[in-house]
Amino acid sequence: MARNKIALIGSGMIGGTLAHLAGLKELGDIVLFDIADGIPQGKGLDIAQSSPVEGFDANLTGASDYSAIEGADVCIVTAGVARKPGMSRDDLLGINLKVMEQVGAGIKKYAPNAFVICITNPLDAMVWALQKFSGLPANKVVGMAGVLDSSRFRLFLAKEFNVSVEDVTAFVLGGHGDSMVPLARYSTVAGIPLTDLVTMGWLTAERLEEIIQRTRDGGAEIVGLLKTGSAYYAPAASAIAMAESYLKDKKRVLPCAAHLDGQYGVKDMYVGVPTVIGAGGIERIIEIDLNKAEKEAFDKSVASVAGLCEACITIAPSLK
């Protein structure tokens, strides 16, 4: 039986972590790609040399030519510039848009049947541009955002309540930025909604709002601490969960930046919503009822993403 092929486009901190995790999970053969010749080859060799110790069999190679990704089943895109302290995700737009154009052309030529997961920031605008540049079906191109944001929310809640992270589910909608919308009403501890836990006295509404704000600032908090880079362990783990659901047809319900075509009243944009990921890619977008305050917050987030997409069109009119 032919093994799956996973192409990791970008061999920085997230790319290297992705390669290691994909190897440990034996998801298939792995290609680390980067235009900086030597880095993907070196990281690929280093990770491959860990396989006898870790006990996984995976052909792991590094490459600096797009032809190496030919026939990939999954492409995970991390190429681009990472945030530095004081930068917003949006500050990266002009630089990383040019990168997405090159990546899109490479995927279009060599891996047109792949399921593509974009991690590059500003996420919602970059995945939108990548889909346009690559010409791949919208259900096969998705952004990694909600899995990470929800994971951060879950961790902070688990620490607050002193319970296992496994018993906390969390729901984050909207753009992957300061306007993201963590939904307390749809987030639970052992099935009990957070709003009920406030009523039960487990925490105050004010404390819950502090946790929600920390979730919004989750990436910036790490950037501020690292000073020379941004998060990579949790983003990589989040993308691997998405890739695994696709490769194994698990049909997991995962919040992702997905292409909306009328859902939630949004047209031709990528925004974070709950999805079902299976062998068909994004097989379903789940529309939930939002109350007035939630809808206003979601619409504000959508407007922020729309502004980024307009900025992309100004730089690259072909995206229109």
Swiss-Prot record:
GO BP annotations of the record are: lactate metabolic process; tricarboxylic acid cycle
Keywords assigned by UniProt, alphabetized: NAD, Oxidoreductase, Tricarboxylic acid cycle
**The protein's enzyme class:** oxidoreductase
Q: What is its EC number?
A: 1.1.1.37
The chemistry this enzyme catalyses reads: (S)-malate + NAD(+) = oxaloacetate + NADH + H(+)
**Residues that coordinate or bind substrate:** R83, R89, N121, R152
Give an example GO molecular function. L-lactate dehydrogenase activity
Q: Which Pfam families match?
A: Ldh_1_C, Ldh_1_N
Give the residues the record marks as binding NAD(+). G10, S11, G12, M13, I14, G15, D34, N96, I119, T120, N121
What are the positions of the active site? Answer: H176 (proton acceptor)
Task: List the CDD domains.
Answer: LDH-like_MDH
- NCBIfam families assigned to the protein according to its UniProt record, in alphabetical order: MalateDH_bact, PRK06223.1
- What is the documented function of this protein? Catalyzes the reversible oxidation of malate to oxaloacetate.
**Cross-referenced PANTHER family:** L-2-HYDROXYCARBOXYLATE DEHYDROGENASE (NAD(P)(+)) (PTHR43128), L-LACTATE DEHYDROGENASE (PTHR43128:SF16)
What family does this chain come from, according to its entry? Belongs to the LDH/MDH superfamily. MDH type 3 family.
- Protein name per UniProt: Malate dehydrogenase
User: Where does this protein come from, organism-wise?
Assistant: Rhizobium rhizogenes (strain K84 / ATCC BAA-868)
Q: Organism classification, top ranks?
A: Bacteria, Pseudomonadati, Pseudomonadota, Alphaproteobacteria, Hyphomicrobiales
